[in-house]
C-alpha cells in the first residue's frame, strides 16, 4: 500500500531543508563538527533554516565563516520548484510543486498544496504522497495512481515554500493579490494533511514531518493546529496519536458498510465498526481535542435525514465534530452535490443532537483547489515521457 520515500536528490548536493534535529546533527558530525559542539551548532543552524527561512548558509551571521563554507561545500538548502500558482476569486491559493528528481528515472514528481485564508486563520493543506492508492470514488486524487511516498523533508518543504510565497519569513513582503488573515500576525496558523495521498500509509515520514513542523524554535506550529486526515487505516491510528500527538480527522462519508465500501473501498478491510472502535481509543481524544469526522454531501446518495440520525447513533461516546462538505465537482465526477436545503437539514439534525456540524464553505472551486479536487500534473508528465520514448 505504501511506496518508498527518498531523502536525497541525484546530481545535486543533499538539501538540509526538512531535516529533523537528529538528522541535522548527523549532517554536522559528517563534515567534522566536534561532538562537543554538535548540540550548539545544531540549534544555531536549525534556527536559521526554520525560523529565518534562509536560502544560503552565508547569511548565518553567528556561525563562523569556516563552518559556513564547509556546509555550502557539502549541503544545500534547495527548495522544490513552484511550477505554477493560481489564486481563486475567494483568495484561496494553489501551488503546483515539482520535487527534485530522486534517481535517474525520476523526471520530477509533482504535488499540489493549497492555502485557504480566513479572517482569523490561514490553513495550509499539504500532501503526503504523489498520487494515492485508495481510489475513493468521489475524490479526484483517487483517480491518480500512487507514484511514491513523500519524504519527511518533502512534506516540510511544502510549508517552507508556502511561507516564502506568503512573505511569512523575516524580511519578506506579503503578496499584494489575494487575501491574508486580518487577525493575528501569522498567515499560516493551521496545517491539515488533507492534500494528495493517505498520510497513514506514509506514517513514519508524516510523524517525522510533524516533529519538525511543531518544533517551538523553528516553524513553531502547535500540534493542536496540525490535523492528520485518514480514510481509516486503523492499525496506524493509535500510533499517530501516541507518537505524533496531532489532531485526527476521519473521512467517514457513509453510515452503512455497503455504501462506504463503494465510496471508500478501504472500508472493505476496516469496516465502520472497527474504525469507530479505533476512534474511541484514540490517545488524547477529549472534548478539548475532538476527532473530526468528514462527511461529503452527495445528492441522493448519503444525505437523507435517516442517515443523519444514524450518524448520531454511530458516534455516541466519541468526542467528535462533524464537518459536512458540499461535494466539489471535478471533470468526469460521477456525483452531484446535495441541494443546499438538504445539507442544512442534515446539519440541523446533527447539531440538535449536541455535535458541532459546520458546513464547510467551498473554497477554490474555480481553480480545482477545493476538497477532493486535487490531482497533480505528474500523470501528464509520465504520459508525455512515454510518448517521447516511443519516437
Curated annotation (Swiss-Prot):
The gene is rlmN. Belongs to the radical SAM superfamily. RlmN family. Keywords: 4Fe-4S, Cytoplasm, Disulfide bond, Iron, Iron-sulfur, Metal-binding, Methyltransferase, rRNA processing, S-adenosyl-L-methionine, Transferase, tRNA processing. GO terms for molecular function: 4 iron, 4 sulfur cluster binding; metal ion binding; rRNA (adenine(2503)-C2-)-methyltransferase activity; rRNA binding; tRNA (adenine(37)-C2)-methyltransferase activity; tRNA binding. This is Dual-specificity RNA methyltransferase RlmN. Reaction proceeds by a ping-pong mechanism involving intermediate methylation of a conserved cysteine residue. It holds the Pfam family RlmN_N. Coiled coil: none annotated. PANTHER family: 23S RRNA METHYLTRANSFERASE (PTHR30544), RADICAL SAM CORE DOMAIN-CONTAINING PROTEIN (PTHR30544:SF5). Disulfide bonds join 125-371. Its EC number is 2.1.1.192. It comes from the Bacteria. It catalyses: adenosine(2503) in 23S rRNA + 2 reduced [2Fe-2S]-[ferredoxin] + 2 S-adenosyl-L-methionine = 2-methyladenosine(2503) in 23S rRNA + 5'-deoxyadenosine + L-methionine + 2 oxidized [2Fe-2S]-[ferredoxin] + S-adenosyl-L-homocysteine; adenosine(37) in tRNA + 2 reduced [2Fe-2S]-[ferredoxin] + 2 S-adenosyl-L-methionine = 2-methyladenosine(37) in tRNA + 5'-deoxyadenosine + L-methionine + 2 oxidized [2Fe-2S]-[ferredoxin] + S-adenosyl-L-homocysteine. It comes from Beijerinckia indica subsp. indica (strain ATCC 9039 / DSM 1715 / NCIMB 8712). Its cofactor is [4Fe-4S] cluster. Its main location: cytoplasm. The active site is at 112 (proton acceptor), 371 (s-methylcysteine intermediate). Binds 1 [4Fe-4S] cluster. The cluster is coordinated with 3 cysteines and an exchangeable S-adenosyl-L-methionine. S-adenosyl-L-methionine binds at residues 197-198, 229, 251-253, 328. [4Fe-4S] cluster binds at residues 132, 136, 139. It is an enzyme of class 2 (transferase). GO terms for cellular component: cytoplasm. Specifically methylates position 2 of adenine 2503 in 23S rRNA and position 2 of adenine 37 in tRNAs. m2A2503 modification seems to play a crucial role in the proofreading step occurring at the peptidyl transferase center and thus would serve to optimize ribosomal fidelity. GO terms for biological process: rRNA base methylation; tRNA methylation.
Amino acid at each position: 500500500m505504501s511506496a518508498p520515500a527518498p531523502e536525497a536528490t541525484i546530481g545535486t548536493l543533499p538539501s538540509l531543508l526538512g531535516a529533523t534535529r537528529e538528522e541535522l546533527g548527523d549532517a554536522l558530525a559528517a563534515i567534522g563538527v566536534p561532538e562537543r559542539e554538535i548540540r550548539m551548532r545544531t540549534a544555531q543552524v536549525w534556527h536559521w533554516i526554520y525560523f529565518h527561512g534562509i536560502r544560503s548558509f552565508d547569511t548565518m551571521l553567528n556561525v563562523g565563516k569556516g563552518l559556513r563554507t564547509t556546509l555550502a561545500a557539502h549541503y544545500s538548502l534547495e527548495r522544490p520548484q513552484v511550477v505554477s500558482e493560481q489564486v481563486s476569486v475567494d483568495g484561496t491559493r494553489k501551488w503546483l510543486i515539482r520535487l527534485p528528481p530522486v534517481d535517474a528515472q525520476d523526471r520530477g514528481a509533482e504535488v499540489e498544496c493549497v492555502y485557504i485564508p480566513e479572517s482569523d486563520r490561514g490553513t495550509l493543506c499539504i500532501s503526503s504522497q504523489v498520487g494515492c492508492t485508495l481510489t475513493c470514488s468521489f475524490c479526484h486524487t483517487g483517480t491518480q495512481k500512487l507514484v511514491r511516498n513523500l519524504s519527511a523533508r518533502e512534506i516540510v518543504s511544502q510549508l517552507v515554500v508556502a511561507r516564502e510565497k506568503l512573505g511569512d519569513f523575516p524580511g519578506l513582503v506579503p503578496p499584494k493579490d489575494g487575501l491574508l488573515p486580518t487577525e493575528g500576525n501569522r498567515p499560516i496558523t493551521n496545517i491539515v494533511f488533507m492534500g494528495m495521498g493517505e498520510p497513514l500509509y506514509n506514517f513514519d515520514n508524516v510523524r517525522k514531518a510533524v516533529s519538525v513542523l511543531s518544533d517551538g524554535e523553528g516553524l513553531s506550529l502547535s500540534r493542536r493546529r496540525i490535523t492528520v486526515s485518514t480514510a481509516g487505516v486503523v492499525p496506524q491510528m493509535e500510533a499517530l496519536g501516541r507518537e505524533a500527538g496531532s489532531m485526527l480527522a476521519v473521512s467517514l462519508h457513509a453510515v452503512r458498510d455497503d455504501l462506504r465500501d463503494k465510496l471508500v473501498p478501504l472500508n472493505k478491510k476496516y469496516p465502520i465498526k472497527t474504525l469507530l472502535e479505533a476512534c474511541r481509543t484514540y490517545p488524547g481524544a477529549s472534548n478539548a481535542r475532538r476527532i473530526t469526522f468528514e462527511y461529503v454531501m452527495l445528492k441522493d446518495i448519503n444525505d437523507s435525514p435517516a442517515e443523519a440520525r444514524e450518524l448520531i447513533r454511530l458516534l455516541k461516546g466519541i468526542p467528535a465534530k462533524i464537518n459536512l462538505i458540499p461535494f466539489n465537482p471535478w471533470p468526469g465526477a460521477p456525483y452531484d452535490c446535495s441541494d443546499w436545503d438538504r445539507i442544512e437539514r442534515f446539519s440541523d439534525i446533527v447539531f440538535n443532537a449536541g455535535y458541532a456540524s459546520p458546513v464547510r464553505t467551498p473554497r477554490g472551486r474555480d481553480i480545482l483547489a477545493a476538497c477532493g479536487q486535487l490531482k497533480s500534473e505528474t500523470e501528464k508528465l509520465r504520459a508525455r515521457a512515454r510518448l517521447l520514448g516511443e519516437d
